[in-house]
Swiss-Prot record:
Bias-annotated ranges (Basic and acidic residues): 31-43, 79-98
WD repeat extents: 116-155, 186-225, 230-271, 348-389, 395-434, 440-478
Keyword DNA-binding: no
Pfam families, alphabetized: Beta-prop_SPT8
InterPro entries: WD40/YVTN_repeat-like_dom_sf, WD40_repeat_dom_sf, WD40_rpt
PROSITE patterns named among the record's database cross-references: WD_REPEATS_2, WD_REPEATS_REGION
UniProt family annotation: Belongs to the WD repeat SPT8 family.
Recorded GO CC terms: chromatin; cytosol; nucleus; SAGA complex
Residue ranges with Polar residues bias: 341-364
Protein name: SAGA complex subunit Spt8
Acidic residues compositional bias, start-end: 21-30, 44-78
Stored SMART domains: WD40
């Protein structure tokens, strides 16, 4: 037993980490032989992976930088757009329409609205935005209509009302209110003339006893606020100054008064001495530079001092010197007023800056008047007597109800009883430049209106309203505008955007038949 125990030998336990079996040595040697190649391959793969990671990282950085640049570009574009919108003001759509109308080669005028009235419509007036329409007639009532729903067709004419008109006339007027043309409890008087505030705050009305009544139309509608008393006969025409603080009135007493609406006093008096006043029209403000001075207005109308030897002056030398001295004194007064110190700088800046409309309205000093006997006068607020006087030409009957200026303010068109429209140029003497003849059976010309392009003239005769082309040289030079037929036209009006035209039929207290209808037309330019 001892021998067996002595002979027995025990091997120590070996862990795999401590040693390998002999047969594993060869495998280990083989593995060692293979490992260098695998290590090289692994190193290459690791290098490739690192390179790919570096490339992807670079691409990510590039993408981030590109995104940042795009964001910066967008921000700069937005800021530049904001600056452009802030620097460049938005275009006024009304100015676009005016520009389009002034350059139009043709106007297509189609009647769409009719307001029948059982009285002679002597006058009508609009607010500046065409929101409200005021009409006055022989029955002694002033009516107020809502224009936009009317022209949009919210109320249609009945079958009986549509019968006298063409097929395009389907819309009727929407009446808002009406009131009597009277003051201090007097009997209602026929409305001979109307003038409305641009925003509809008040309306002026001419009465048969010579008064001019001012009605409130926005607050206490139809309330007679005051009455201007100076005329002794019916006030046949009213013309608001551009500032809407003054008004010209003409009457059957052959007098024209210039009123201050703030005080109710007559500033100036103009005696026509020839006949009942039938029309008063201010010279267009576009005829002069709207940013110029009063002397520019005079020079554009009557020539320049530098060319006094070459042009036909309408004033003599003494009058020209007086006007120059007056304009110099006015300019000196303006300079003294601007030199006066003020309380704050902001108020001085606001006082000195004027809008184009305000500055141009302050310069509308020249106007024309026509008398029922056919005589026409051109006046200036800075002079007592008329600047120009156009007598009735030989062979022409003594009758004139309307006259108008051309858009540039250099020509005057006046309608005659014998169906002729005479054209005068204020720089070329007192004889008509040419005569536009209507058909023999057309009747007297009761109203004329010049279109914004200066090429077309709207002429209303007893039979029809015509659109006359002043540049036509052969053939018939006019087109008949459908709608009106068989009556005198008391008033014609084209809105500032040249999208609508309006006509009213009335005799204004003189002899003549009427259709007793107010018509509205839509104008399409081309």
């Amino acid at each position: 037993m001892e021998a067996e125990e002595s002979e027995s030998f025990s091997y120590p336990m070996l862990l795999p980490s401590d040693g390998l079996y002999p047969e594993d040595d060869d495998d280990a040697d083989m593995d060692q032989d293979k490992n260098p190649e695998e290590n090289v391959m692994n190193e290459k793969e690791d290098e490739d992976v690192d390179a790919v990671d570096e490339k992807s990282g670079e691409e990510d950085v590039e993408m981030d930088t590109m995104e940042d640049e795009n964001e910066n570009d967008e921000d700069t574009e937005q800021t530049s757009e904001k600056k452009e919108t802030e620097e460049t003001p938005k275009e006024n759509p009304l100015e676009k329409l005016k520009q389009k109308a002034s350059t139009a080669s043709f106007y297509d005028v189609v009647p769409t609205l009719a307001i029948p009235m059982a009285t002679s419509i002597n006058a009508f007036a609009f607010t500046s935005d065409l929101k409200w329409l005021f009409t006055g007639g022989e029955d002694g009532y002033i009516r107020k209509y809502d224009f936009f729903p009317s022209i949009n067709g919210d109320l249609s004419l009945t079958v009986a009302q549509r019968h006298p008109f063409v097929d395009t006339v389907t819309k009727a007027g929407i009446l808002l209110n009406y009131w009597e043309n009277a003051y201090d409890g007097n009997k209602p008087s026929s409305v001979y003339s109307l003038a409305a505030h641009s925003r509809g705050l008040w309306v002026l009305s001419g009465v048969n006893n010579g008064d001019i009544i001012l009605y409130s139309t926005r607050h206490q509608e139809g309330y007679p606020v005051t009455s201007l008393k100076k005329h002794t006969a019916p006030v046949s025409c009213l013309a608001l100054h551009g500032s809407e603080k003054k008004v010209l009135s003409g009457s059957w007493d052959k007098m024209v008064y210039y009123w201050d609406l703030n005080t109710g006093d007559a500033i100036s008096t103009y005696n026509c001495e020839s006949g009942q006043i039938s029309n008063i029209v201010y010279r267009p403000s576009g005829a002069v530079n709207p940013w110029g001075s009063e002397s520019d207005d005079m020079r554009s109308l009557f020539g320049t001092p530098a060319s006094s030897s070459s042009y036909d002056a309408l004033f003599d030398e003494e009058v020209e010197k007086a006007i120059e001295e007056e304009t110099k004194s006015v300019q000196a007064n303006e300079e003294n007023e601007t030199e006066k110190p003020s309380q704050t700088e902001s108020t001085t800046n606001n006082d000195n800056i004027k809008a184009p409309s305000e500055s141009s309205s302050e310069e509308s000093n020249i106007f024309l008047t026509t008398s029922i006997d056919g005589v026409m006068n051109v006046w200036d607020h800075r002079m007592v007597d008329s600047v120009l006087k156009y007598p009735v030409p030989k062979g022409v009957p003594p009758w004139a109800m309307s006259a108008c200026w051309s858009p540039d303010g250099n020509n005057i068109y006046i309608g005659r009883r014998n169906g002729i429209v005479e054209e005068y140029n204020i720089h070329s003497g007192k004889e008509p430049v040419r005569s536009l003849k209507m058909p023999l059976d057309s009747g007297p010309v009761s109203n004329v209106y010049s279109m914004p392009n200066g090429r077309h003239l709207v002429i209303s005769s007893f039979d029809n309203i015509r659109l006359y082309d002043l540049q036509s040289k052969a053939g018939i030079g006019f087109l008949i505008i459908p709608g009106h037929h068989g009556g005198l036209v008391s008033s014609l009006y084209v809105d500032t955007s040249c999208q609508f035209m309006f006509s009213a039929s009335g005799n204004r207290g003189w002899q003549g038949t009427t259709t007793e209808v107010f018509l509205g037309y839509q104008i399409m330019t081309s």
